[in-house]
Amino acid sequence: MGIKKPFEISLEVNDSCNYSCEFCFGKNSVDKRIDLSREQAKKVIEKIAAEGIERIRFTGGEPLLWPHLQEIISFAKQQGLFTSLNTNGSLFSKESAKELAPVLDDVLVSFHALNDKSEQQLCGQKGLFDKKISAIKDLANQGVFVRASTILSGQNISALEEFNKTLE
């Protein structure tokens, strides 16, 4: 019984983030921020494609802060890979959604809370929830398959139904 090759590889392109979430281990890091170089990313993608792995997921920190994101996602697409992006969603605009849509198959937008007030308390900024909802709409309007993720707890489970209605 051999080990099967992975179906998907996650590539962490940076560890920078535009949030300061109270629960995140990265917010207190005193180390220099790390960005994957364009050349390193291309080598990894070539290796993934050569090994017959079908999917690549771009993660971070916040991958939309990485200056090479569009170029490298396009490169992955040219290699025949299914491309996914994990993001907090706050940096998307109608323009960036339109630019990335042709090379993105799937986007996962993370919600740390189920409403704007709670998101602000956890992440230290106002209006983040609405930015995420706007990003989802912009991406979906461009034909990108968009998913939302969140963590449920005893503190927020009562807001789940309202959250689902918002996403519809």
Residue ranges and their predicted role:
Residues 11, 58-59:
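Catalytic metal- and UDP-sugar-binding loop of GT-A-like glycosyltransferases, i.e.
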Residues 35-58, 66-168:
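Radical SAM/AdoMet-radical enzyme domain recognition
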Residues 2-39:
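Canonical Radical SAM [4Fe-4S] cluster-binding loop centered on the CxxxCxxC motif
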Residues 62:
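Conserved G/P- and acidic residue-centered "switch" motifs that form tight phosphate/ATP-binding loops
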